[in-house]
Amino acid sequence: MDKHIPVLLKESIEYLNIKPDGIYVDCTLGRAGHSSEILKKLNQKGFLYAIDQDQIAIDQAKEKLEQINNNFLLIQGNFSNLSALLAINHVFNVDGILYDLGVSSPQIDIASRGFSYKMDGPLDMRMDLNSTLTAHQVINTYSESQISEILFKYGEESFSKSISKKIVESRPINSTLELVEIIKSALPQKVLKQKKHPAKKTFQALRIYINNELIALENSLKQALDLLNSKARICVITFHSLEEKIVKNIFNNSTNYYQEQLLSNLPIKADLNSKFKLVIKKPIKPSLLELEQNHRSHSAKLWVIEKN
C-alpha cells in the first residue's frame, strides 16, 4: 500500500469545481497527487501554480506533472507569502486554491531530515533548509518551561511537563530515536500501551513550531480569500484540531456564520450580505473505503468556502 495516497482526492477535486480554462493554486504540492488531478482537468488556457517549501518535492513533482502537460509553474516558497509569490508571476486573481495540510512531502521519508520518529536521524525538522531554527536547537537550548509550552500548545500533549523535564535532564540529545526513548521514559505505561506512537505528539509539536505552521496557515488563508474570483473556491484538508480551529474561524468569520447563528434566535431579520459562503456546513470526512485503504486519512477533514 502506498502510504502517500492523496487524502480525500476525489472529494477535494470535485468541490474545487474546476473550470478547464481557470487559474488554480495548489499551496501544498508535496508529491503532486492533487496537482496531477487538477492539471488533468485544465485545457490549454488553464494554468496551475503549485507551491512547496522543499526543493526536493519540486524537482520530483516536475517530472510527474510534465507527463500530463506543461500548463503549470512550480514555486519554491512558504504559502504564508501566497499573494507575493503569485504577484511575482503577475497573478492577482484565481479560480480555486487547494491546501492539503497533511505531512506527505518527500523529505518525511528521508531519515537525515529528522521528521520521523521511526527512523534514526539528526534533530532537524526544517521543511525549508534555508531556514535556521532546528529541532536540535530547541531540544538542547530551550528552557524546560519553553519546551513544555511548545509540546502542550502545538502537540496537545497531556504529559508535556514530564517529557520536557526528562529532555532537559538528558541533554545533550542528538538524534531522533534518542529523543523517542527519552519521551517513552517520561510516559506512564497506560500511554505506552496505546496504539498511537508515544512520540507522535511531541514530534508534531516540534515540527509545527520550527516551521511556524499555524501562523503560516492563518496568514495564507486570509490572503487566499482576497485572491478569489467570483464563484471561486478554497478547499482545505486538515489533519488535527489546531488546523481545524484556524480554518473554521477564518471561514466562519468570512461568511457571517457566527452572526447568523446569533440572530437566528432573535425575532428580527437582518440583511447580512457576505462576500463568501460555506459550500458545506460541516466538513467532509473520508469514506469507509478510503479509511480502509489509506491510514493517513483517519483524521482528515475537507472544508470548502466560495466567493459569491
Swiss-Prot record:
Q: Where does the UniProt entry say this protein principally localizes?
A: cytoplasm
Per its UniProt record, what SUPFAM superfamilies does this chain match?
Putative methyltransferase TM0872, insert domain, S-adenosyl-L-methionine-dependent methyltransferases
Q: What is this protein called?
A: Ribosomal RNA small subunit methyltransferase H
Q: Which reaction does it catalyse?
A: cytidine(1402) in 16S rRNA + S-adenosyl-L-methionine = N(4)-methylcytidine(1402) in 16S rRNA + S-adenosyl-L-homocysteine + H(+)
Entry's EC annotation? 2.1.1.199
Compartments where located: Cytoplasm
Q: Name one GO biological process term.
A: rRNA base methylation
Q: Which organism is it from?
A: Mycoplasma mycoides subsp. mycoides SC (strain CCUG 32753 / NCTC 10114 / PG1)
A Gene Ontology MF term for this entry?
rRNA (cytosine-N4-)-methyltransferase activity
Q: Where is it found, in Gene Ontology cellular component terms?
A: cytoplasm
Swiss-Prot/TrEMBL keywords = Cytoplasm, Methyltransferase, rRNA processing, S-adenosyl-L-methionine, Transferase
Q: Could you name the domain of life of the organism this protein comes from?
A: Bacteria
